[in-house]
Amino acid sequence: MKILGIETTCDETAAAVVTLGEDERGQILANEVLSQIAEHAAYGGVVPEIAARAHVEVLDRLIARALQRAGTTLKEIDGIAVAAGPGLIGGVLIGLVTAKTLALVARKPLLAVNHLEAHALTPRLTDGLAFPYLLLLASGGHTQLVAVKGVGDYVRLGTTIDDAIGEAFDKVAKLLGLGYPGGPEVERQAESGNPERFALPRPMIGRRQADFSLSGLKTALRIEAERLEPLASQDVADLCASFQAAVVDVVVDRVRVALRAFAGVAGHPTALVAAGGVAANGAIRRALAAQAGEVGLSFVAPPLPLCGDNGAMIAWAGLERLRLGLVDDLTVPARARWPFAEVAPAA
């Protein structure tokens, strides 16, 4: 079984081919990604119109390249998976219309994938992970703690009530005059900084629910930065280190709460998982690995190239759905907003 995956929900254009090996484990035959960082850097963030135009310009040839690298043809593909949301609606439409056209012309099943679900299922591609597991899904636009019980079966245990983790990193980077995207820049600066110089708050720590709030932390950092202006290079490094340390503490505490809630909705987790672009952050990965070890769980995070948006995760989610007979027709809509997990009942 070979699946073509197409991803255009934000500022990466991606196409990939994924198959099942003889051991029933996922295998990536091709994974092509074109980033738009250069196009958006001057604006300090993603400009939807520019993103959509860039997808149009490169998607067709990227799909062709993925098929070629995989040593296959559209005729040999068993299904066409596409991220149908959530995301920037212009980009989502471009990917979805392309996938619908290919499915119609080649007479292949169309598999409309939730972008967040694809992140959630990536550990099953990379590690063959069994259900159920606790997922921290953290990216520029989303921060959620989710009990992943099965394909299409998710229970949200916590979410952010304001900024997503990746969004907070990006805003801090912009405030400090760092480059775009902000997350890697803040992490790089933090390596040479003192995480104890600034006593920044740890919002929501100790709360019974597993929700996040980072706006107060971001505001506290801004106040410190304004007090120190003009900022020396060491000030910037120390602010980044202090901010990252605060985020790590919040994440670990929120995961601890979610682990307690997990048993009530899904039994015992097989692992603690991190996915999404923020899962590439080394400090967060190390802290989560330590937290998992304390409670006797393994910690799983995708390889760094699969933390950000990519076509392989879309193809894999499509493959998982196709094996269950979950096929979509050509009327499936593009969705700017598309929640993929139910809200857990209040304790």
Swiss-Prot record:
Fe cation binds at H115, H119, D309. SUPFAM superfamilies: Actin-like ATPase domain. It catalyses: L-threonylcarbamoyladenylate + adenosine(37) in tRNA = N(6)-L-threonylcarbamoyladenosine(37) in tRNA + AMP + H(+). It is found in: Cytoplasm. Substrate binds at L137, A138, S139, G140, G141, D170, G183, N281. Its cofactor is Fe(2+). InterPro entries: ATPase_NBD, Gcp-like_dom, KAE1/TsaD, TsaD. The keyword Isomerase does not apply. GO terms for biological process: tRNA threonylcarbamoyladenosine modification. Keywords: Acyltransferase, Cytoplasm, Iron, Metal-binding, Transferase, tRNA processing. Its EC number is 2.3.1.234. GO terms for cellular component: cytoplasm. One of its GO terms (molecular function) is N(6)-L-threonylcarbamoyladenine synthase activity. The keyword Transferase applies. Required for the formation of a threonylcarbamoyl group on adenosine at position 37 (t(6)A37) in tRNAs that read codons beginning with adenine. Is involved in the transfer of the threonylcarbamoyl moiety of threonylcarbamoyl-AMP (TC-AMP) to the N6 group of A37, together with TsaE and TsaB. TsaD likely plays a direct catalytic role in this reaction. Belongs to the KAE1 / TsaD family. NCBIfam families: gcp_kae1, T6A_TsaD_YgjD. This is tRNA N6-adenosine threonylcarbamoyltransferase.
